[in-house]
């Protein structure tokens, strides 16, 4: 039996509503299922956050979750999203496999 693959999704969120973020995320998850039949998606969309949470708080929490991932998946637009860029640097520096939305074109 194949091993479960833990996937962290790095997704630009600035300027998007919670609904837009969740819709994009659900679409990506459905596409990932064809590449990873035994995938566990690490939930990194924070719904219950401190009311005064700053962007760096979210990034810190995301990096903690990312440490559990086998693969970090980068949604389109990650190159211009500050948090996604930092997550990308962390994945590369710490040897976590990366995958990009353009990889799902097939």
Task: Spell out what each predicted region is.
Residues 1-106:
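Conserved catalytic or regulatory cores that recognize and/or transform ribose-phosphate-containing ligands
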